[in-house]
């Protein structure tokens, strides 16, 4: 019964604060930043957004800005991929990465695969 009351109080507090109480746990923030750094440090690909190519450094800066503006809604690395790093919120077009050999990969797939790899690394 105490657990139900605590859960209810936490939910009520989050609503009362307009979502301000919601924030990604530190380990999820770390995973999100690792995904962004994974893109940022790649020299062998380009980031494609709304038909234009960007360097990976530019992509990382853009994704951090988008995360900052939507941050309170993003609680996990998977949500980051799905809601921020997958598609344009303006046009709805999916983001892509172009590898050095010309292969295009949806950014959602690219980051989901990297997240899976990260999850299987020793801590």
Feature-to-residue mapping (PLM):
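N-terminal secretory signal peptides
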Residues: 24-69
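Generic preference for hydrophobic/aromatic residues in regular secondary structure cores
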Residues: 1, 45, 95-97
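N-terminal export leaders
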Residues: 3-17
């Amino acid at each position: 019964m105490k657990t139900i009351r605590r859960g209810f109080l936490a939910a009520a507090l989050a609503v009362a604060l307009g979502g301000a109480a919601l924030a990604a746990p530190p380990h999820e923030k770390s995973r999100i930043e690792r995904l962004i750094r994974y893109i940022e440090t790649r020299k062998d690909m380009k980031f494609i957004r709304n038909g234009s190519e960007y360097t990976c450094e530019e992509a990382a800066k853009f994704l951090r800005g988008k995360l900052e503006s939507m941050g309170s809604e993003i609680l996990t690395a998977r949500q980051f991929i799905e809601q921020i790093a997958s598609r344009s919120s303006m046009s709805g077009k999916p983001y892509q990465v172009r590898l050095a050999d010309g292969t295009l990969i949806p950014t959602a797939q690219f980051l989901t695969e990297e997240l899976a790899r990260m999850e299987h690394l020793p801590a």
